[in-house]
Amino acid sequence: MPELLRLEHFGFTYPQQPCPALADVSLTVRQGEFWVLCGASGCGKTTLLRQLKPALRPHGAAEGRILFDGQPLDDLPPHRQAADIGFVLQSPEEQTVTDKVWHELAFGLESLGCDTPSIRRRVAEMASFFGIQDWFHKKVDELSGGQKQLLALASVMVLQPRLLILDEPTSQLDP
């Protein structure tokens, strides 16, 4: 399988902190692989994951390299970063950008410039796949925490990213 993501001796230190949050992290993720990152609360899992989506990176000093598809991640145009790297945050409230469920599903595709027929088809497929048709026309603020988490996941999956990052994706799902 081709290499998709590589970290080489990556480290990160938050501003005004004496110790690094991450030190000498090296790993390779190949297309089609499924990885699980486990560790105690506060050990740096979210800090590491946010390094993989430049728009979500915290401020601080980084060292080492992150390569996506063989090139430095920071050299990828923003359009490719948005399309190829999907990220579902721990808290869906931090991810929601529109007021209606259907528009939340369509927003990313609209932002990437997809044509209307493709948007409608892909949104309908995701709504069906996740079983959210019954609340498709609801306002996002009327949803439960679990429904919001499911919507956040569906909103990223509709983009069909090459790399999908889930930061505690089931933390608020309804039983």
Residue ranges of each PLM-predicted region?
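The feature captures the beta-strand-to-loop junction immediately N-terminal to the Walker
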Residues: 38-40
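Conserved ABC transporter NBD signature motif
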Residues: 61-72
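Conserved ABC ATPase signature
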Residues: 139-143, 147
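A short, flexible loop at the N-terminus of ABC-type nucleotide-binding domains that lies
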Residues: 1-7, 12-24, 56-59, 75-77
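Conserved ABC ATPase "signature" region
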Residues: 117-135
